[in-house]
Amino acid sequence: MPKVTYDAIKGLVQKSGSGIELEGDIALTGGLTATGALSVTGSATLSAALIGSVDTRAEAGAVSLTKLTTLVTVTGGADRAITLAAGTAGQIKIIILTSKGGAGNAVLTPSVLEGGTTITFDAAGDAVVLVYTGAKWAVVSNIAAAIA
């Protein structure tokens, strides 16, 4: 498929390569769905909510790196060991313990954590917001979780 570019003066122009390239200001009415990565060079201004996808975890294991938020539930007396692999520099990850039934806690072990090695969630509502620095996960917000 040839590459199509839009130029404000020339209109649609066919070039070698593939994809679509748009230059100048673009007004979009309606929805836009991007499958795969969407890159924005420059500022992105949102006039409505930014809504990220959600991962739910009720068992031990790795939390999703491709979803913004992970909601964790714990039932029973045993701790839930959850892990978080290295991310991409600037990546944001939100983890919330939404429900707890029993004595067990959710214990998160990120690949590398600034200021500790684990984050323990022991009550519903405990939450952290993490940002990956390119070398480690940094806690930028913590609601009642224990970092050790």
Give residue ranges: language-model regions.
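Intrinsic low-complexity, repeat-rich intrinsically disordered segments enriched
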Residues: M1-L68, V107-T109, L113-G116
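Viral virion structural and adsorption modules
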Residues: P2-T5, V13, F121, W137, ...
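Sterically constrained small-residue positions within well-ordered secondary structures
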Residues: K3, A86, S99, T120-F121
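Beta-strand-connecting loops/turns
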Residues: G17, G90-I92, G125
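Short amphipathic beta-strand/extended segments with alternating polar/hydrophobic composition
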Residues: E21-D25, T83, D122-A123, S141-I143
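Extracellular disulfide-bonded cysteine-rich modules/repeats
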Residues: A123-G134
